[in-house]
Amino acid sequence: MILFSVSPVSIWVFVIYAVTIIIAIYRLFFHPYAKYPGPFLAKLTSWYSIYHTYYGDLHIDIWECHNKYELGNYVRYGPNRILVNTSEGLNAIYSQGKNTQKAKAYRKVSLVPGVHPTFSMIDNQGHAKLRRLVGQGLSNAHIRMYDQELRQSALLFASRLGEEIDRFEPNQPHGNHDGWTSPKNVASWSNYFTFDVMSHLVYGTSYDLLTDSENHWVIEGVLGQMRRISFLTMLPELEDMRFDRILFPDARRKAYRFSAKSREILEARKSKSEEMRHQDAKVDVFLRLLSAKDPETGESLSDKQLWAESNLLIIAGSDTSSTGLAASFFYLSRNPSAYDRVKQEVRSALTTSEDISQGPKLLSCTYLRACVLESLRLSPPLGGAMWRQTMPGGLFIAGSDHDFHIPGGCEVGTGVYAIHHNEEYYPEPFRFRPERWLPQEVGDEAVAKAQSAFQAFSLGPRSCPGKNLAMLEIPFALAAVMMDYDFRKVDSPLGGVGEGKGKFVGQYQTFWAFTSIKDGPYIQFKRREP
């Protein structure tokens, strides 16, 4: 008799190989999502989405998948994930009272160790409790109190763009000696503006990014935090396997540096809280959060929750708004008819800087608002999918010919960039066409259809708490610029920075990092002729 000797290593290799084959067969043929088309590798492993996260084109790949596969509105984008590209799916997944909760991956997403802010809290009841508290600091009534601060920041933003030479990039080519400034990277200046606004609103103090470069590193800190989150929402096990140190070591370091700085500011701000309570001082968001009590339980936020929520508010409120603002400059500088129309509207409605307010004059600038909405549609700040897990019983999504049932325990989402470029809701989806948001020009039905698929700030109870502020910041800044300056795209290679290539020419293309990392457009400014 011949005896074969098999080493323990060989046995383990065989077991791992066999288990891998079994898992692959299950995912390809027996998984509840097996019937849905999608990239072959995505059906087998989440490393497919990690690849597109690493290269920052995940939002584009999602759009391409919807256009490539036969069941175009339903695409499998992970072993346990499906994308839905319809307004019915969008509302079924994200609206109030639906049978979904945040995906399990968000358990790894924490801006402060051991604490989950509203953004990453999975439990719906816990989220509702936190949202009630945070909402007290970002109510419309509170935002109205900051009208003057918003206006002053917008006017400072405009004056910085109007300077002949960029104070933070003095080596840029000078203007053409005909009144035009040197090229300005509007992405950078938009970051400075929105971050100053949010830090002032939240902490009652500003990082002064519009006037001093000392704290410009905080922008990189925010982007580092977002880059880290983008990987963890795709594959949360990365941190357990220590792959975060390989895939995004610099992002991780920047994220922690920003968190430490925000804690320092929080402690300094907290020490002044008692003093401010007894003064006739304007109440910032932090003081409101500090004083907020849940109307049902009477509970208030812990110190760590205060840190996490204030961190989140600054990041969410600044990063999303800055993308919308930079995108607005991009599209207006490339669409002369829209630029001329909105410029005329603003200059006719607003006669002094005091008119830049939450009053009837700025509100009457409906085409300005339409330009902002169209820019957010074409280049959404959060272009990927916000994943949700279906609860027991699953989720039913209405379809044109039959309903779709998503089983419980599976993950589902809608790619924001993809649905924003779905011609079912947006005819000529790659064309900058602000008129699509004006009922008097396209009709109520067309506007309602466009609104049904618009998700720049998400929907329902998990929507961005700062969306109302964002829709003020951007028009304030654009109005402040257009009241005093003309602007144009730079006529040099710098003018192409931020623009897509090939079929995406004319599009403001961002790097997907959960939110958006952006560069450009480079714009020149010239003081308005009297």
Curated annotation (Swiss-Prot):
Q: Which GO terms describe its molecular function?
A: heme binding; iron ion binding; monooxygenase activity; oxidoreductase activity, acting on paired donors, with incorporation or reduction of molecular oxygen
Task: Cite the PANTHER family for this sequence.
Answer: CYTOCHROME P450 (PTHR24305), CYTOCHROME P450 MONOOXYGENASE ATNE-RELATED (PTHR24305:SF237)
Looking at the keywords, is Oxidoreductase present? yes
The UniProt entry, under Gene3D superfamilies, shows:
Cytochrome P450 (1.10.630.10)
Taxonomic superkingdom: Eukaryota
Could you tell me the membrane topology recorded for this protein? Single-pass membrane protein
The Enzyme Commission number assigned here is 1.-.-.-
Q: What class of enzyme is it?
A: oxidoreductase
Question: What parts of the sequence cross the membrane?
Answer: 6-26
Glycosylated residues: list them. Answer: 85
Question: What does the entry list as the binding residues for heme?
Answer: 464
**Role this protein plays:** Cytochrome P450 monooxygenase; part of the gene cluster that mediates the biosynthesis of the cyclic tetrapeptide apicidin F (APF). The non-ribosomal peptide synthetase apf1 incorporates four different amino acids to produce apicidin F: L-phenylalanine, D-pipecolic acid (D-pip), N-methoxy-L-tryptophan and L-2-aminooctanedioic acid. L-Phenylalanine is the only proteinogenic amino acid directly used by apf1. The 3 other apf1 substrates are non-proteinogenic and have to be modified by other enzymes of the cluster.
InterPro entries to which the protein is assigned, alphabetical: Cyt_P450, Cyt_P450_CS, Cyt_P450_E_grp-I, Cyt_P450_sf, Cytochrome_P450_monoxygenase
Biotech relevance: Apicidin F, like the other known apicidins, is a cyclic tetrapeptides with anti-malarial properties via histone deacetylase inhibitory activity.
**Where found in the cell?**
Membrane
What's the source species' lineage? Answer: Eukaryota, Fungi, Dikarya, Ascomycota, Pezizomycotina
Q: Which UniProt keywords apply?
A: Glycoprotein, Heme, Iron, Membrane, Metal-binding, Monooxygenase, Oxidoreductase, Transmembrane, Transmembrane helix
Q: What induces it?
A: Expression is positively regulated by the apicidin F cluster-specific transcription factor apf2 that binds to the eight-base-pair motif 5'-TGACGTGA-3' called the 'Api-box' that is found in all promoters of the apicidin F cluster except in the promoter region of apf2 itself.
Q: Which Pfam families match?
A: p450 (PF00067)
Tell me the protein's name.
Cytochrome P450 monooxygenase apf7
What cofactor does its activity depend on? heme
Q: From which organism does this entry originate?
A: Gibberella fujikuroi (strain CBS 195.34 / IMI 58289 / NRRL A-6831) (Bakanae and foot rot disease fungus)
Of which family is this protein a member? Belongs to the cytochrome P450 family.
Listed GO cellular component terms? membrane
Q: List the disulfide bonds.
A: none
